[in-house]
Structures are given as structure tokens and as C-alpha cells.
């Protein structure tokens, strides 16, 4: 009988110790309770209720770079162009970031590529290659407005390559 109490006490001690979560700097832990969003914990030590709460995501708030590698686009004069870009962003709202889409970086990449293709399809190939700054600014405005709904702050979208195929 005493062994049962010792085992039970050991389980309680281990569960209690495992329930304290230390969140590092520039990181947010997203916690779900009973399968739905409960809270987001910032830097510091937090208590997670055993068997009820679950840390479902550990999100970095540090600035991140997302490459957009060698995609194709067609200009208004039906010339194929190859483009590569770099997207710099940071997470501003962990709840929106973790709950809005299944894979937010992939959605951001897809949205950026679609915006580039839309802008490039409206101009000729020569104009597209000459006016890369204008294209970047137009795409940046479109993408940053949409990315705010996903809890992201897009700080820069830079074309690294725009050339004829």
C-alpha cells in the first residue's frame, strides 16, 4: 500500500515539474486547452495545466527571411521571365500566425509569387526588367496588407533575379 502512495506522489511531482514551461527570449508558445486556442505565452516561466493544456507551437518573433526560388512569370507580351525574390518578415501576432493557415510561410510565399505574376503580366518584358523597383513596391503593398491578417509584418520584398528565360 505504501508503494502505491509513493508511486502516486512521484507521478504528481513529475507532472507538476513538467508543467512549468520556460519560454526563451523572442519566442512565443501557443497553448491550446481542450483542442482550441487558450493563450500565447511570452518570455518567462509559465504554468501549463497537466493533461488539459498543450503547447502546440513555438513561434520565433525574430526577423526571418523566406526565399522565393526561380519561379516563372509571363509578361504582357507573352515573354517568359524567371524571378527569384527574398521576403523579410516577422511574426507580430502568434495567435493569428498559428491559427489562420496550416503553413503560414508557404502561404506567404505563394501569395508573393501570385502578386509578382499579376504585376509582371500587366507590363512588357522590357519594362518589367527595367522597373524592378516599381514591381517590388507594388508587390510589397499587396502582400503586406494581406500578411497582416496572418499575424505577420512584412518588412521587405526584394527581387534578387528577374531575367528572360
Question: Where are the regions a protein language model picked out?
Answer:
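Single-pass alpha-helical transmembrane signal-anchor segments
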Residues: 2-20
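Short, compositionally biased strand/turn segments
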Residues: 7, 40, 134-138
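Membrane-cytosol interface motif
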Residues: 28-48
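Amphipathic, interface-forming alpha-helical segments with heptad-repeat character
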Residues: 23, 31-34, 52-165
Amino acid at each position: 500500500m505504501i508503494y502505491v502512495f509513493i508511486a502516486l506522489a512521484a507521478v504528481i511531482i513529475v507532472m507538476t515539474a513538467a508543467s512549468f514551461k520556460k519560454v526563451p527570449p523572442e519566442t512565443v508558445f501557443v497553448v491550446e486547452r481542450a483542442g482550441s486556442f487558450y493563450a500565447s505565452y511570452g518570455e518567462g516561466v509559465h504554468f501549463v495545466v497537466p493533461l488539459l493544456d498543450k503547447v502546440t507551437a513555438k513561434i520565433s518573433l525574430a526577423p526571418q527571411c523566406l526565399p522565393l526560388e526561380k519561379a516563372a512569370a509571363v509578361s504582357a507580351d507573352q515573354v517568359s521571365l524567371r524571378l527569384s525574390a527574398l521576403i523579410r518578415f516577422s511574426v507580430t501576432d502568434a495567435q493569428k500566425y498559428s491559427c489562420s493557415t496550416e503553413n503560414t510561410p508557404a502561404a506567404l510565399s505563394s501569395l508573393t509569387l501570385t502578386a509578382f505574376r499579376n504585376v509582371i503580366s500587366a507590363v512588357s518584358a522590357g519594362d518589367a526588367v527595367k522597373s524592378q523597383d516599381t514591381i517590388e513596391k507594388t508587390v510589397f503593398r499587396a502582400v503586406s496588407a494581406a500578411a497582416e491578417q496572418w499575424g505577420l509584418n512584412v518588412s521587405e520584398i526584394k527581387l534578387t533575379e528577374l531575367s528572360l528565360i
